[in-house]
From Swiss-Prot:
InterPro entries: Aminoglycoside_PTrfase, Homoserine_kinase_II, Kinase-like_dom_sf, Pseudomonas-type_ThrB. It catalyses: L-homoserine + ATP = O-phospho-L-homoserine + ADP + H(+). Pathway: Amino-acid biosynthesis; L-threonine biosynthesis; L-threonine from L-aspartate: step 4/5. It is an enzyme of class 2 (transferase). NCBIfam families: PRK05231.1 (NF003558), thrB_alt (TIGR00938). Belongs to the pseudomonas-type ThrB family. Keywords: Amino-acid biosynthesis, ATP-binding, Kinase, Nucleotide-binding, Threonine biosynthesis, Transferase. It comes from Beijerinckia indica subsp. indica (strain ATCC 9039 / DSM 1715 / NCIMB 8712). The keyword Ion transport does not apply. This is Homoserine kinase.
Amino acid sequence: MAVYTHISETDLKTFLASYDIGNALVLKGIAEGVENSNFFLQTERGFFILTLYEKRVEEKDLPFFLGLMEHLSRRGLNCPQPVHNRSGHALGRLAGRPAVIVTFLEGVGADVADARRCAAVGEALARLHQAGADFAGKRTNALGLAAWRPLFETVRDRADTVAPALAATIAEELDFLEAHWPRALPQGVIHADLFPDNVLFRGETLSGLIDFYFACVDAYAYDIAICLNAWCFEPDLTFNIGKGLAFFTGYEHVRKLTAEEAAALPVLARGGALRFALTRLVDWLNVPKGAMVNPKDPLEYMGKLAFHQTVGTVRELGLLR
Protein backbone atom coordinates (compact mmCIF):
# COMPACT_ATOMS: atom_id res chain seq x y z
CA MET A 1 0.00 0.00 0.00
CA ALA A 2 1.05 3.61 -0.56
CA VAL A 3 -0.27 7.06 -1.45
CA TYR A 4 0.30 8.51 -4.91
CA THR A 5 -2.92 10.53 -5.27
CA HIS A 6 -4.19 12.90 -2.61
CA ILE A 7 -7.89 13.46 -1.96
CA SER A 8 -9.56 16.78 -1.22
CA GLU A 9 -12.19 17.03 1.50
CA THR A 10 -14.77 18.16 -1.05
CA ASP A 11 -14.11 15.24 -3.39
CA LEU A 12 -14.31 12.75 -0.53
CA LYS A 13 -17.60 14.17 0.72
CA THR A 14 -19.11 13.96 -2.77
CA PHE A 15 -17.86 10.39 -3.22
CA LEU A 16 -19.21 9.17 0.12
CA ALA A 17 -22.61 10.76 -0.49
CA SER A 18 -23.51 7.80 -2.71
CA TYR A 19 -22.83 5.29 0.10
CA ASP A 20 -24.74 4.39 3.25
CA ILE A 21 -21.71 4.48 5.55
CA GLY A 22 -22.08 8.00 6.95
CA ASN A 23 -19.79 11.00 6.75
CA ALA A 24 -16.00 10.78 6.99
CA LEU A 25 -14.48 11.36 10.42
CA VAL A 26 -10.87 10.38 9.65
CA LEU A 27 -8.98 9.82 6.39
CA LYS A 28 -5.34 8.82 6.81
CA GLY A 29 -2.91 7.77 4.10
CA ILE A 30 -1.14 4.43 4.44
CA ALA A 31 2.50 4.61 3.36
CA GLU A 32 3.27 0.88 3.37
CA GLY A 33 3.34 -0.92 0.03
CA VAL A 34 4.07 0.33 -3.46
CA GLU A 35 1.16 -0.18 -5.83
CA ASN A 36 -2.02 1.80 -5.08
CA SER A 37 -3.10 4.81 -3.01
CA ASN A 38 -4.61 3.48 0.20
CA PHE A 39 -6.31 5.26 3.06
CA PHE A 40 -7.65 4.29 6.44
CA LEU A 41 -11.21 5.65 6.48
CA GLN A 42 -13.31 6.09 9.59
CA THR A 43 -16.90 7.18 9.09
CA GLU A 44 -19.88 7.61 11.37
CA ARG A 45 -20.67 3.92 10.83
CA GLY A 46 -17.35 2.17 11.09
CA PHE A 47 -13.86 1.59 9.75
CA PHE A 48 -12.93 0.94 6.13
CA ILE A 49 -10.06 0.96 3.65
CA LEU A 50 -10.36 3.29 0.66
CA THR A 51 -8.22 2.38 -2.35
CA LEU A 52 -7.46 4.43 -5.45
CA TYR A 53 -5.99 2.24 -8.18
CA GLU A 54 -2.74 3.32 -9.80
CA LYS A 55 0.12 2.01 -11.89
CA ARG A 56 0.01 -1.70 -12.65
CA VAL A 57 -3.66 -2.28 -11.83
CA GLU A 58 -5.84 -2.03 -14.93
CA GLU A 59 -9.44 -0.91 -14.48
CA LYS A 60 -10.71 -3.79 -16.61
CA ASP A 61 -9.32 -6.23 -14.01
CA LEU A 62 -11.12 -4.71 -11.04
CA PRO A 63 -14.34 -6.75 -11.40
CA PHE A 64 -12.17 -9.89 -11.16
CA PHE A 65 -10.51 -8.74 -7.93
CA LEU A 66 -13.73 -7.55 -6.32
CA GLY A 67 -15.68 -10.63 -7.38
CA LEU A 68 -12.91 -12.87 -6.10
CA MET A 69 -12.96 -11.30 -2.64
CA GLU A 70 -16.72 -11.80 -2.44
CA HIS A 71 -16.40 -15.39 -3.66
CA LEU A 72 -13.65 -16.27 -1.19
CA SER A 73 -15.65 -14.78 1.66
CA ARG A 74 -18.62 -16.97 0.74
CA ARG A 75 -16.26 -19.95 0.89
CA GLY A 76 -15.23 -19.07 4.43
CA LEU A 77 -11.97 -17.17 3.83
CA ASN A 78 -11.65 -14.00 5.89
CA CYS A 79 -10.77 -11.22 3.44
CA PRO A 80 -11.98 -7.65 2.83
CA GLN A 81 -15.40 -7.22 1.28
CA PRO A 82 -16.19 -4.48 -1.27
CA VAL A 83 -18.76 -1.98 -0.04
CA HIS A 84 -21.50 -1.30 -2.60
CA ASN A 85 -23.02 2.14 -3.07
CA ARG A 86 -26.75 2.80 -3.24
CA SER A 87 -26.75 1.95 -6.94
CA GLY A 88 -25.33 -1.48 -6.18
CA HIS A 89 -21.86 -0.75 -7.57
CA ALA A 90 -18.62 -1.43 -5.70
CA LEU A 91 -16.41 0.42 -8.18
CA GLY A 92 -16.50 4.22 -8.39
CA ARG A 93 -14.21 7.12 -9.29
CA LEU A 94 -12.47 9.54 -6.97
CA ALA A 95 -9.78 12.14 -7.76
CA GLY A 96 -9.68 10.89 -11.32
CA ARG A 97 -8.91 7.30 -10.30
CA PRO A 98 -10.96 4.10 -10.04
CA ALA A 99 -11.83 3.76 -6.36
CA VAL A 100 -13.23 1.13 -4.02
CA ILE A 101 -14.15 1.03 -0.34
CA VAL A 102 -13.64 -2.32 1.39
CA THR A 103 -14.35 -3.51 4.90
CA PHE A 104 -11.64 -3.18 7.53
CA LEU A 105 -10.23 -6.39 9.00
CA GLU A 106 -8.98 -6.54 12.56
CA GLY A 107 -5.37 -7.58 12.99
CA VAL A 108 -1.85 -6.46 12.19
CA GLY A 109 0.67 -7.55 9.59
CA ALA A 110 3.24 -10.14 10.57
CA ASP A 111 6.31 -8.20 11.66
CA VAL A 112 7.79 -11.48 12.93
CA ALA A 113 7.58 -14.48 10.59
CA ASP A 114 8.28 -17.36 12.96
CA ALA A 115 7.69 -21.03 12.18
CA ARG A 116 4.23 -21.06 13.77
CA ARG A 117 3.09 -18.21 11.57
CA CYS A 118 4.68 -19.79 8.51
CA ALA A 119 2.58 -22.90 9.15
CA ALA A 120 -0.55 -20.77 9.50
CA VAL A 121 0.20 -18.98 6.24
CA GLY A 122 0.82 -22.26 4.44
CA GLU A 123 -2.54 -23.57 5.57
CA ALA A 124 -4.30 -20.31 4.67
CA LEU A 125 -2.76 -20.32 1.19
CA ALA A 126 -3.93 -23.87 0.56
CA ARG A 127 -7.44 -22.94 1.71
CA LEU A 128 -7.37 -19.95 -0.65
CA HIS A 129 -6.40 -22.26 -3.51
CA GLN A 130 -9.24 -24.61 -2.65
CA ALA A 131 -11.79 -21.83 -2.15
CA GLY A 132 -10.93 -20.21 -5.48
CA ALA A 133 -11.08 -23.43 -7.47
CA ASP A 134 -14.68 -22.86 -8.58
CA PHE A 135 -14.41 -19.09 -9.10
CA ALA A 136 -15.67 -18.33 -12.61
CA GLY A 137 -13.52 -15.25 -13.19
CA LYS A 138 -10.39 -15.47 -15.32
CA ARG A 139 -7.31 -13.25 -15.32
CA THR A 140 -3.91 -14.13 -16.71
CA ASN A 141 -0.83 -13.25 -14.67
CA ALA A 142 0.17 -9.82 -15.99
CA LEU A 143 3.50 -10.16 -14.16
CA GLY A 144 4.28 -13.72 -15.18
CA LEU A 145 7.32 -14.98 -17.06
CA ALA A 146 6.34 -13.33 -20.36
CA ALA A 147 6.32 -9.90 -18.70
CA TRP A 148 9.73 -10.04 -17.07
CA ARG A 149 11.99 -9.36 -20.06
CA PRO A 150 9.94 -6.37 -21.32
CA LEU A 151 9.91 -5.03 -17.76
CA PHE A 152 13.66 -5.45 -17.51
CA GLU A 153 14.21 -3.60 -20.78
CA THR A 154 12.60 -0.48 -19.29
CA VAL A 155 15.42 -0.21 -16.73
CA ARG A 156 18.30 -2.20 -18.23
CA ASP A 157 20.36 0.90 -18.97
CA ARG A 158 20.05 2.13 -15.36
CA ALA A 159 20.24 -1.15 -13.46
CA ASP A 160 23.97 -0.91 -12.82
CA THR A 161 23.44 2.36 -10.93
CA VAL A 162 21.80 0.22 -8.24
CA ALA A 163 24.51 -2.47 -8.12
CA PRO A 164 27.53 -3.32 -10.29
CA ALA A 165 26.78 -5.83 -13.08
CA LEU A 166 23.13 -6.05 -12.04
CA ALA A 167 21.91 -5.84 -15.64
CA ALA A 168 24.08 -8.76 -16.74
CA THR A 169 23.01 -10.87 -13.75
CA ILE A 170 19.34 -10.30 -14.50
CA ALA A 171 19.76 -10.96 -18.22
CA GLU A 172 21.50 -14.27 -17.52
CA GLU A 173 18.77 -15.36 -15.11
CA LEU A 174 16.06 -14.47 -17.62
CA ASP A 175 17.76 -16.69 -20.18
CA PHE A 176 17.77 -19.57 -17.69
CA LEU A 177 14.14 -19.14 -16.64
CA GLU A 178 12.83 -18.85 -20.18
CA ALA A 179 14.60 -22.11 -21.02
CA HIS A 180 13.57 -24.05 -17.89
CA TRP A 181 10.20 -22.67 -16.77
CA PRO A 182 7.86 -25.49 -15.65
CA ARG A 183 4.73 -26.01 -17.74
CA ALA A 184 1.41 -27.82 -17.27
CA LEU A 185 1.32 -27.63 -13.48
CA PRO A 186 -1.98 -27.62 -11.54
CA GLN A 187 -3.38 -24.12 -11.59
CA GLY A 188 -6.23 -21.94 -10.45
CA VAL A 189 -6.67 -18.67 -8.59
CA ILE A 190 -3.51 -17.57 -6.78
CA HIS A 191 -2.89 -14.55 -4.55
CA ALA A 192 0.55 -13.83 -6.07
CA ASP A 193 1.52 -11.29 -3.39
CA LEU A 194 1.02 -12.96 0.00
CA PHE A 195 3.75 -11.07 1.85
CA PRO A 196 3.75 -10.61 5.64
CA ASP A 197 2.06 -7.20 5.35
CA ASN A 198 -0.83 -8.85 3.49
CA VAL A 199 -1.53 -11.40 6.22
CA LEU A 200 -3.20 -10.18 9.40
CA PHE A 201 -2.78 -11.73 12.84
CA ARG A 202 -4.49 -11.16 16.16
CA GLY A 203 -1.92 -12.46 18.58
CA GLU A 204 -0.79 -15.77 17.11
CA THR A 205 -4.06 -16.38 15.26
CA LEU A 206 -4.24 -15.61 11.55
CA SER A 207 -7.22 -13.29 11.19
CA GLY A 208 -7.35 -12.47 7.49
CA LEU A 209 -5.75 -12.07 4.07
CA ILE A 210 -5.73 -8.74 2.25
CA ASP A 211 -4.54 -7.01 -0.96
CA PHE A 212 -5.77 -9.26 -3.77
CA TYR A 213 -4.80 -6.89 -6.57
CA PHE A 214 -2.23 -9.22 -8.14
CA ALA A 215 -4.52 -12.25 -7.93
CA CYS A 216 -4.77 -14.21 -11.16
CA VAL A 217 -4.98 -17.70 -12.59
CA ASP A 218 -1.57 -19.37 -12.55
CA ALA A 219 0.26 -22.37 -11.10
CA TYR A 220 -0.47 -23.00 -7.42
CA ALA A 221 3.19 -23.94 -6.92
CA TYR A 222 4.27 -20.50 -8.14
CA ASP A 223 2.16 -18.96 -5.36
CA ILE A 224 3.92 -21.27 -2.91
CA ALA A 225 7.31 -20.16 -4.25
CA ILE A 226 6.39 -16.51 -3.71
CA CYS A 227 5.43 -17.28 -0.11
CA LEU A 228 8.64 -19.20 0.57
CA ASN A 229 10.60 -16.16 -0.55
CA ALA A 230 8.47 -13.74 1.47
CA TRP A 231 8.25 -15.74 4.71
CA CYS A 232 11.18 -18.12 5.08
CA PHE A 233 14.31 -15.98 4.76
CA GLU A 234 16.09 -14.36 7.68
CA PRO A 235 17.10 -10.66 7.60
CA ASP A 236 20.63 -11.67 6.55
CA LEU A 237 19.07 -13.47 3.53
CA THR A 238 19.81 -16.97 4.76
CA PHE A 239 17.00 -19.42 4.09
CA ASN A 240 15.45 -20.87 7.26
CA ILE A 241 14.63 -24.46 6.37
CA GLY A 242 12.65 -24.83 9.61
CA LYS A 243 10.27 -22.13 8.42
CA GLY A 244 10.08 -23.82 5.04
CA LEU A 245 9.21 -27.13 6.70
CA ALA A 246 6.51 -25.42 8.79
CA PHE A 247 5.05 -23.70 5.72
CA PHE A 248 4.86 -26.94 3.72
CA THR A 249 3.39 -28.80 6.70
CA GLY A 250 0.64 -26.22 6.97
CA TYR A 251 -0.04 -26.23 3.24
CA GLU A 252 -0.12 -30.00 2.86
CA HIS A 253 -2.44 -30.31 5.84
CA VAL A 254 -5.05 -28.96 3.40
CA ARG A 255 -3.76 -29.74 -0.10
CA LYS A 256 -1.06 -32.23 -1.09
CA LEU A 257 1.45 -31.14 -3.70
CA THR A 258 1.87 -33.33 -6.76
CA ALA A 259 5.28 -34.78 -7.55
CA GLU A 260 5.51 -32.43 -10.53
CA GLU A 261 4.81 -29.40 -8.36
CA ALA A 262 7.42 -30.42 -5.82
CA ALA A 263 10.06 -30.96 -8.50
CA ALA A 264 9.30 -27.57 -10.07
CA LEU A 265 9.62 -25.52 -6.90
CA PRO A 266 13.36 -24.72 -7.07
CA VAL A 267 12.94 -23.11 -10.51
CA LEU A 268 9.67 -21.43 -9.53
CA ALA A 269 11.38 -19.96 -6.47
CA ARG A 270 14.06 -18.48 -8.72
CA GLY A 271 11.34 -16.98 -10.88
CA GLY A 272 9.45 -15.63 -7.91
CA ALA A 273 12.61 -13.97 -6.64
CA LEU A 274 13.39 -12.39 -10.01
CA ARG A 275 9.81 -11.16 -10.46
CA PHE A 276 9.94 -9.13 -7.26
CA ALA A 277 13.52 -8.01 -7.84
CA LEU A 278 12.41 -6.61 -11.21
CA THR A 279 9.30 -4.79 -10.02
CA ARG A 280 11.22 -3.40 -7.06
CA LEU A 281 13.99 -2.26 -9.40
CA VAL A 282 11.49 -0.46 -11.62
CA ASP A 283 9.88 1.18 -8.60
CA TRP A 284 13.25 2.08 -7.07
CA LEU A 285 14.27 3.92 -10.22
CA ASN A 286 10.89 5.58 -10.85
CA VAL A 287 9.50 6.97 -7.59
CA PRO A 288 6.97 9.71 -8.50
CA LYS A 289 7.80 13.11 -7.06
CA GLY A 290 5.70 13.86 -3.99
CA ALA A 291 4.44 10.29 -3.56
CA MET A 292 4.02 8.99 -0.02
CA VAL A 293 5.69 5.65 -0.65
CA ASN A 294 8.66 3.71 0.67
CA PRO A 295 10.19 1.82 -2.29
CA LYS A 296 11.45 -1.66 -1.48
CA ASP A 297 15.09 -2.62 -2.03
CA PRO A 298 15.46 -4.78 -5.16
CA LEU A 299 18.78 -6.17 -3.93
CA GLU A 300 16.99 -8.06 -1.16
CA TYR A 301 15.37 -10.23 -3.80
CA MET A 302 18.56 -10.53 -5.82
CA GLY A 303 20.09 -11.99 -2.66
CA LYS A 304 17.24 -14.48 -2.38
CA LEU A 305 17.70 -15.35 -6.04
CA ALA A 306 21.39 -16.03 -5.40
CA PHE A 307 20.42 -18.59 -2.75
CA HIS A 308 17.93 -20.33 -5.04
CA GLN A 309 20.57 -20.59 -7.76
CA THR A 310 22.41 -22.98 -5.42
CA VAL A 311 19.39 -25.18 -4.63
CA GLY A 312 19.25 -28.63 -6.20
CA THR A 313 16.05 -30.19 -4.80
CA VAL A 314 12.95 -29.11 -2.95
CA ARG A 315 14.23 -30.85 0.19
CA GLU A 316 16.59 -27.89 0.59
CA LEU A 317 13.49 -25.68 0.86
CA GLY A 318 11.85 -27.80 3.57
CA LEU A 319 9.59 -30.18 1.63
CA LEU A 320 10.75 -33.60 2.75
CA ARG A 321 9.98 -35.76 -0.26
